[in-house]
Regions:
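Short hydrophobic beta-strand element within catalytic cores of glycosyltransferases
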Residues: 317-321
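Carbohydrate-associated surface elements
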Residues: 46, 169, 191
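Short alpha-helical donor nucleotide-sugar binding micro-motif in glycosyltransferases
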Residues: 279-280, 287-292
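N-terminal subdomain of nucleotide-sugar transferases
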Residues: 1-60, 397, 401
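Nucleotide-sugar donor phosphate/pyrophosphate-binding loop at the beta->alpha transition
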Residues: 124, 134-155
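A conserved mid-protein helix/loop that constitutes part of the nucleotide-sugar donor-binding site
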Residues: 23, 216-239, 249, 256-262, ...
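Aromatic "clamp/platform" in nucleotide-sugar-dependent glycosyltransferases that forms part
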Residues: 300
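Conserved acidic donor-binding segment of nucleotide-sugar-dependent glycosyltransferases
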Residues: 332-333, 337-345, 354-359
Length: 401
């Protein structure tokens, strides 16, 4: 069988980066090409600067210019519907030119366009679920717009020919809440490439910008939303500072909870003990991993845990919540990182104090983690994805015969 021509749909793709999804889709697309597994076209949204079409690292990227996304969730739903209409129109035109064998959509944000295009092309539809609205809101999806998003995700996963989940936790979660048949969801974890994590800054100068030589830096990274659990880390910090004294925090990210988190920091007397950096690019982030004394991932809900993986690959000791996909990235046994009871700020404080006070433990975790992260290889991710494509296309051929 010749390698398939695949159309990947994603609402974000570099240079537009909202979160981890853009990075995931880029690396997957590039590795599908690099491993000779597929010819890959990515259909995504663009801006006033990005070219409408270009070839990047062997990937054909097609962009549809869209207005800046609104921050208000009610307006966002209408914006997503408009984006899907535009992606659908562009996809129809691309299909006439390229004749795709398979459509691969990422998350609910491109579900409608993916469904219509797969129907038009008479080809299989694969979807990757990176997170669910049910999980993000701890099961509260009874009111609009959460109910709408949950409904789209339910329809999308049942309509797809196959669903990809990034962890065994997510496979079970998706199968349960959307009543999917056994075997309909396949686990293909996210990957990492340590070469991508090379810092761009002078690390000594960068560290001096945020901390004195005798101060310890605690790094938190991600979207500033409730489910990421940053409020737990802030709650834990006053006691840590009282015990150890010379501790500062850095929070890298932006989101709807930013104002609340800053207000919480002020209320806890932390304004002079850390910095909210806002959104930062990958180059700066990779440098922050190198200057931090530890990275904390305190999520209440986490399908996978890419931040933890990146931190470990960068040689930064890591503490994660004992929840979701983080359990697979940082297995039990304190071999590659520490885990704390999810939602428990007091236990988090204990683990942070322990790690900052034990250099032998820190060094051992860093050494073990550097080997552990090698098992999350993007080439393996691409090959597993290509095998799934082959299985789905084979099933489609048998059905059509």
């Amino acid at each position: 069988m010749t390698k398939p021509r695949v159309l990947i749909l994603s609402w974000e793709y570099p240079p537009i980066v909202e979160g981890g999804l853009a990075r995931h889709v880029r690396k997957l697309a590039e590795q599908l090409v690099a491993t000779g597994s597929a010819e890959v076209h990515v259909l995504t949204r663009g801006d006033d600067v990005s070219p409408a079409e270009e070839e990047l690292d062997g990937v054909f990227v097609h962009r549809v210019r869209e207005p800046r996304r609104p921050t208000e969730l009610g307006e966002f739903i209408a914006w997503v519907e408009h984006m899907n209409a535009d992606l659908l129109a562009a996809g129809v035109e691309l299909g006439d030119r390229w004749h795709f064998d398979l459509v691969h959509g990422h998350d609910w944000l491109v579900a409608v366009a993916g469904d219509h295009l797969a129907n038009r092309f008479r080809c299989p539809l694969v979807v990757t679920v990176h997170a669910t609205e049910y999980g993000r809101h701890q099961g509260w999806v009874k009111e609009h717009p959460q109910s709408h998003i949950h409904g789209v995700e339910n329809w999308m996963t049942n309509r797809a020919d196959r669903v990809i989940a990034c962890s065994a936790y997510m496979r079970d979660h998706i199968s349960d809440i959307y009543s999917l048949d056994e075997g309909h969801v396949e686990v293909i974890p996210n990957g990492i490439d340590p070469i991508d994590l090379v810092p761009a800054d002078d690390l000594e100068t960068l560290r001096a910008e945020f901390a004195e030589p005798d101060e310890r830096l605690i790094l938190l990274v991600g979207r500033l939303v409730y489910e990421k659990g940053f409020h737990l880390a802030l709650e834990a910090l006053p006691g840590i500072i009282e015990t150890l004294g010379n501790v500062r925090f850095l929070i890298a990210g932006s989101g709807t909870a930013e104002a609340d988190l800053k207000a919480q920091a002020t209320e806890l007397g932390l304004d002079d003990h850390g910095t909210f950096l806002g959104w930062i690019g990958d180059d700066k982030l990779h440098s922050l991993y190198r200057i931090a004394d530890l990275t904390v991932v305190p999520s209440l809900y986490e399908p996978f845990g890419l931040v933890a993986l990146e931190a470990m690959a960068s040689g930064c000791p890591t503490i994660v919540a004992d929840t979701g996909g983080l359990r697979e990235v940082v297995p039990e046994g304190e071999r590659v990182g520490l885990r704390f009871n999810g939602g428990d700020a007091e236990h988090l404080a204990i683990m942070i104090e322990r790690l900052l006070s034990d250099d032998v433990l820190r060094d051992r975790l860093v050494a073990e983690a550097s080997e552990h992260v090698l098992s999350f290889d993007w080439a393996d991710v691409a090959r597993s994805t290509a095998q799934l494509y082959s299985d789905v296309l084979g099933s489609e051929a048998k059905t059509s015969a």
